[in-house]
């Protein structure tokens, strides 16, 4: 009997990610249950090259129109935008979404069916936000979840080190990463998410 093997991302797909990594955003949804067993949907956008979480928002009723508006907001305030947007084949990425994204000038790249590894960077962030934040917090409602995620994203972007980018945080200034003070100063710990995490700074 011929043995079958699970195949990873194709060489063509890997080449695309390698060649255009600095021009790619990825987006995805994940679900969060509140303490009253309501289901909330979290939509987020992450930059492939820097690992910066560009946008995160919560809704109880995701639609193609709502999802498209999130991409529009990503491109506001002179943030710039990517050339490519990687996402799966969820029904929320419908005709309205397609039209709005195309008008912005971003090309959609749909992953194959049942291939989460094709959107691995987005999937990895979902794992991080769950294990480092949501698994330790009781969520009361939509507003509370938005607040918790905003605080975690601030920590993730500005302070959390990433192995894939040389143990730097996505938005950390290079000066912070390389600065060595000639004079020793007191180090203070600043709590994040109710002391779930801490960031460390030199005292002024």
Segments and roles (model prediction):
Residues 1-204:
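Charged DNA-binding/catalytic regions of mobile-element recombinases
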């Amino acid at each position: 009997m011929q043995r079958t093997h699970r195949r990873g991302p194709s060489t063509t797909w890997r080449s695309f990610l390698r060649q255009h990594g600095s021009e790619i955003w990825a987006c995805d949804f994940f679900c969060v249950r509140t303490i009253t067993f309501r289901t909330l949907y979290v939509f987020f956008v992450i930059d492939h090259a820097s690992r910066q979480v560009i946008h995160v928002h919560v809704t109880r009723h995701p639609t193609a129109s709502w999802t498209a508006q999130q991409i529009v907001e990503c491109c506001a305030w002179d943030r710039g935008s990517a050339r490519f947007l990687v996402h799966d084949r969820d029904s929320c990425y419908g005709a309205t979404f397609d039209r709005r994204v195309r008008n912005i000038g971003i090309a959609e790249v749909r992953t194959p069916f049942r291939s989460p590894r094709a959107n691995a960077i987005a999937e990895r962030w979902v794992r991080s936000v769950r294990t480092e934040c949501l698994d330790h917090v009781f969520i009361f409602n939509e507003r509370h979840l938005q607040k918790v995620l905003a605080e975690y994203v601030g920590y993730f972007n500005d302070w959390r080190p990433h192995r894939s980018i040389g143990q730097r945080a996505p938005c950390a200034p290079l000066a912070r990463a390389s600065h060595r003070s000639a004079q020793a100063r007191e180090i203070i710990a600043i709590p994040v998410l109710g002391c779930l995490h801490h960031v460390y700074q030199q005292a002024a």
